UniProtKB/Swiss-Prot annotation:
It comes from Roseiflexus sp. (strain RS-1). Its EC number is 4.2.1.33. Catalyzes the isomerization between 2-isopropylmalate and 3-isopropylmalate, via the formation of 2-isopropylmaleate. This is 3-isopropylmalate dehydratase large subunit. GO terms for biological process: L-leucine biosynthetic process.
Amino acid sequence: MTPRTLFDKVWDAHIVRPQTAETPAVIYIDLHLIHEVTSPQAFTELRQRGLKVRRPDRTLATMDHSTPTTPRGADGIIPVVDAQAAAQLRQLEQNCAEFGIPLFALGSEYQGIVHVIGPEQGLTQPGMTIVCGDSHTSTHGAFGALAFGIGTSEVAHVLATQCLIQTRPKTMEVRVDGRLAPGVTAKDIILAIIARYGVGAGTGHVFEYTGETIRALSMEERMTICNMSIEGGARAGMIAPDDTTFEYIAGRPFAPKGKAWDEAVAYWRTLPTDEGAVYDRIITLDASQLTPMITYGTNPGMGMPIDGRIPTPEELPDPAARQALDKALRYMDLRPGQPLLGHKIDVVFLGSCTNSRISDLRMAARLLKGRKIADGVRMMVVPGSQQVKKQAEAEGLHEIFRAAGAEWREAGCSACLGMNDDKVPPGRYAVSTSNRNFEGRQGPGARTFLASPLTAVASAIEGAVADPRRYLGG
């Protein structure tokens, strides 16, 4: 038998109708995750066409994008002030009730960011196909699943048929080797990959991350890597399942139990790429040479080492890249050749589906413990789910954040996309652990530096872009 990649195995196992020269493939979807922003039109289409949800048992909804993260009132209820957000949340509740879809609503102990709750509930499993009306669905690929975002019309199609029309993408091995230096995290790995190879490197491909560095990462670190595959242009990102994967899934609410668990693990062990399998393209990264990373522009590919300098137009041979740099620096009010270390900041956001899990909060709290954030800096700490929040509070992490002067908020997408009052004011600078730094992403006129939780905390302490390595061990 011809050796196959991880992607090949998962794709081939889900073909309902093979791809031909004239038509794309039809593939079966194992898990469909939905939220309040990209699903309303899909449900409207179902009603108009008299259709039902084919597999409500393979569908799960949560509220995350529009949910306020404001602390609960005296009555224990999270207040929803924004009228549009309230309407979206009500609509999702009505849609799920009508079509029989389980929902983790605002106020549920399991509510949270869709790409946080899937893994923590044990819904995300190796070998699955997983879709959601959200581009960062690639997060679930950390488990050896084929997971990607879909559009609203495709959401309707999956709800009605549990299938999806797709053209088979190519494969790209992203090999990462070398031991990480202190202060360098999974977030720095993915920012470095995107900075080196560009936001279009993965166009038409699925990334498979391999190498000793990837194998040494925890599951939550692997999720950070796969989360930003889309920022590298890829359709999805995958990491082969191993014992680290199985240990993470074991015992979670929706994980297989008993004999079914043994059978599942036996199958999952067959998924890693076969020796001799051929990728369409291979790129590499020496992780031992990495330092903490930070972005300086208006796409995630505009990144550099924390102690570096913004490139000059002369360093960019491509005219389009020079034009993009000029436009980005005008928006960011920065100069070519300028260092970012010491650049004043106004906001720090610790959260998003990239970096809001318990390990991220632990990492940040360790660095912040016994310290204060700088005067004039607003720091928002937003756990990725109610379960993460509960665990963090059980460990006393929230008290560390509050004692330092940070806001401890409820679970949700929050400032990643500038929802409700979780915004960066116009013209102000934020160090953010999220995944996108587009113009206006965190609020009209907001200027975003993407970085790791460690860099975010160090910057909050200094009130300026800071290198976290100076705080390690102290």
